[in-house]
């Protein structure tokens, strides 16, 4: 199986399955001298771990991380950083009766067509549990970016038909982790919670939208043509399971605008070139403008629902009916928030190292003033 490595100058390779012994990540390209502890990574993993509220799966996992290599006396060494999280609460018996059944909306059929076999327990490699490895890698990326004044924050802006009002970065920081749906608009959060509860009570699920905002990214990050910053962000976010669309800045709404509405006029602010508005989402021509980078990921409803659905037995070819049991998220949107943060952080740190804005050898050699 290929496609398990992400990035160029700062690379992560994830491994593990939902019901295997554990999952983890190997990071290559992190500079030496970055202060890093298991607590740094654990803080990020705790944001996505299951069983924290009624809107997530009730699978109980502590998701305790172990750093196996690449860190000595609290500092990265410049060698590969390996991290492992062991599974503790897998219940594979719930999948035994559907081991040969293609679950609608899942990767089962595609895996069988490509590989001729699959780990049917909890989706195996295609499970959303794989994203904990991305969050662990993103934790290191975020720690490195923080030395350069770059922060990445995400929040839920829609669940089902409930939309949040626009939020400032201060509101996002202050409110997102105060509610189980990870919404910065606390009044909308209550309505979103009701939307998720209604879907669960109807043996159904619901999707939504996560918005990610990166601040402090200097102008000049990204390259023209195929490795445009926005192209890389879209690629990274589309790689998250369940994401079906990505927007940058005004996104799809820009198709209905005139140029006079869409264009962000330039101005100077504290001696630096800025734009009066930010409909471009902080990126023009594939290169950052110095304004906040804003992107959104649309996430489909969780495909695991307990309603009867038509499907096919992949062993016999016979049509059949499936009713999925087990522990599943009625909405994966809230737990996608830290995953989206991680993927955006990984893109930005990779591009900043590639572009010479972060020292690729030593994190101690930081001249952060050049990037602010």
Swiss-Prot record:
InterPro entries: Chorismate_synth, Chorismate_synth_AroC_sf, Chorismate_synthase_CS. FMN binds at residues 125-127, 285, 300-304, 327. It holds the Pfam family Chorismate_synt. The keyword Amino-acid biosynthesis applies. Its cofactor is FMNH2. Its EC number is 4.2.3.5. GO terms for cellular component: cytosol. Disulfide bonds: none annotated. Pathway: Metabolic intermediate biosynthesis; chorismate biosynthesis; chorismate from D-erythrose 4-phosphate and phosphoenolpyruvate: step 7/7. One of its GO terms (molecular function) is chorismate synthase activity. It is an enzyme of class 4 (lyase). The keyword NADP applies. NADP(+) binds at residue 48. This reaction introduces a second double bond into the aromatic ring system. Belongs to the chorismate synthase family. HAMAP family: Chorismate_synth. This is Chorismate synthase. It comes from Methanocella arvoryzae (strain DSM 22066 / NBRC 105507 / MRE50).
């Amino acid at each position: 199986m290929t496609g398990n490595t992400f990035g160029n100058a700062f690379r992560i390779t994830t491994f593990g399955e939902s019901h295997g012994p554990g999952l983890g990540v190997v990071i290559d390209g992190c500079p030496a001298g970055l202060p890093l502890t298991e607590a740094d990574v654990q803080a990020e993993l705790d944001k996505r771990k299951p069983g924290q509220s009624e809107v997530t799966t009730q699978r109980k996992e502590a998701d305790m991380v172990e750093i196996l290599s690449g860190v000595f006396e609290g500092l990265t060494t410049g060698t590969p950083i390996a991290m492992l999280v062991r599974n503790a609460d897998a219940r594979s018996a719930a999948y035994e009766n559907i081991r040969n059944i293609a679950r609608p909306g899942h990767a089962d059929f595609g895996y069988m067509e490509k590989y001729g076999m699959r780990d049917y327990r909890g989706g195996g490699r295609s499970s959303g549990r794989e994203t904990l490895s991305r969050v662990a890698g993103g934790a290191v990326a975020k720690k490195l970016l923080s030395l350069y004044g770059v922060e990445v924050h995400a929040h839920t802006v829609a669940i089902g038909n409930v939309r949040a009002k626009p939020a400032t970065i201060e509101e996002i920081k202050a409110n997102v982790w105060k509610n189980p749906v990870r919404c910065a608009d606390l009044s909308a959060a209550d309505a979103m919670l009701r939307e998720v509860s209604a879907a669960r009570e109807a043996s159904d699920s619901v999707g939504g939208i996560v918005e990610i905002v990166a601040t402090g990214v200097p102008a000049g990050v990204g390259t023209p043509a195929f490795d445009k910053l926005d192209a890389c962000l879209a690629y990274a976010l589309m790689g998250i399971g369940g994401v079906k669309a990505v927007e940058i800045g005004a996104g799809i709404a820009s198709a209905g605008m005139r140029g006079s509405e869409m264009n962000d006029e330039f101005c100077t602010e504290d001696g630096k070139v800025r734009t009066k508005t930010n409909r471009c989402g902080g990126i023009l021509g594939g290169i950052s403008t110095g304004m906040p980078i804003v992107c959104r990921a649309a996430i489909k409803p969780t495909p695991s629902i307990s309603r009867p659905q038509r499907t096919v037995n992949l062993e016999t070819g016979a049509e059949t009916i499936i009713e999925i049991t087990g522990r599943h998220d009625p909405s994966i949107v809230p737990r996608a928030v830290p995953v989206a943060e991680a993927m955006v952080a990984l893109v930005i740190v990779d591009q900043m190292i590639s572009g010479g804005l972060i020292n690729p050898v030593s994190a101690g050699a930081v001249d952060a003033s050049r990037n602010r």
